[in-house]
Amino acid sequence: MSATPGALDGLRVADFSRVLAGPIATMILGDLGADVVKVERPGSGDDTRAWGPPWSPEGVSSYYLGVNRNKRSIALDLKDPADAETARALSLRADVVIENFRPGVMARAGLDHETLRAHRADLVSCRIAGLGRGDLPGYDFLAQAMGGLMSITGDAGGEPHKVGVALVDVMAGLHAAIGILAALRHRDATGEGQLVEVDLLSTTLFSLANQASNWLTAGVVPGRMGNRHPSIAPYETLRASDGPFVIAVGNDEQFRAMCGVLDLPELAGDARFATNSARVTNREALLDALAPTLRDASAAVWVTRLGAAGIPCGMVNQVDQAFALAREVGLEAVATVIGDDGVAVDTVANPLHLSRTPTTYRLAPPGIGEHTEAIRAELTP
């Protein structure tokens, strides 16, 4: 734990969010030094506390532990008038209020932005919605399906697949954190708060990037291509003697260098492969020409040889291998936090590295209502 104040030291966040998108956003704020108070339902708490297996050795959901460090927890029933009043006091003391309930839940408790801003004009509120501003449910899986992401994920001619992690939720959380920081910058300049809104459908469409642009600018509806890139070749999974590796040849110079490593100079001089656009057009012929040579050595050998020549390539790692690689290249990818009970929890380190105000890991993911009494005491006049 660093004694250096974080960039958001002194910032107070009332966090009514649960599951992933909101908790990712508030964990980022907490890593940067904010005091985040997580509001949970008495008894059951955040939905993800019940999501398992796997569980930690202490029986806590690994899912929950992954996105809830650097937070304190207060247990409040928003349908109970006294608890709702406590929630309002907490919110009016905060700089930021964040939630991802269905529309109307916060308003019924008197916690919506319009109600709160009548008492705190400088308050920043953030709402993470589902598929737009309506009442559609906000689940990542639905967003991936309905937002087009699954239509471009999977093998050509095969079934559509979701990404292997709730990526839309993660990205929505990142956008929420960015929006909150932008709103705070405006507040610091003008004294005026505002409402920040992020929804899963817009987040999914934004994440489509070049695939969305293919439709918007060229009228091309993208489809599934497995691990291939629609506009670059070879930029895909190749098969060596013992399994796959990936290569990302981004320009013609790299392609010529690749041909040199593979001892296939004739491919570099072949008009079908001389330019990237030609290689995309003649992808199947190119892959057929590469296949016999690639079968002569292992994936690790090819990655070593190609990498030494400056050609972007890599192994297809499992998660444990990915963390091992991070250690090998000098990254501190694991952040260990110690709870008041002395239990150590390993979490994924924040990828932000700030030279003057580094991220810190001060608090382990809390138990349900672990800090209720202390927080109530802070709210007492």
Which residues are covered by each model-predicted region?
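N-terminal helix-loop segment corresponding to the beta1-alpha1 unit
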Residues: M1-G179, A183-A189, I338, G367, ...
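Conserved PLP cofactor-binding pocket of PLP-dependent enzymes
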Residues: G307-E328
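Oxidoreductase and adenylate-handling cofactor-binding alpha/beta cores
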Residues: G173-G193, S207-A218, C259-E266
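Terminal low-complexity tails and localization/encapsulation signals of metabolic enzymes
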Residues: M1-R12, G223, R239, Q321-P381
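Conserved Rossmann-fold dehydrogenase catalytic segment
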Residues: R133, G157-V165, D188-T204, G223-P230, ...
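Aromatic-enriched alpha-helical interface/lid elements that frame and gate functional surfaces
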Residues: R228, A233-A309, C313
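Flexible glycine/proline-enriched surface loops and loop-helix/loop-strand junctions
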Residues: E159-L167, R239-G243, T357-T360
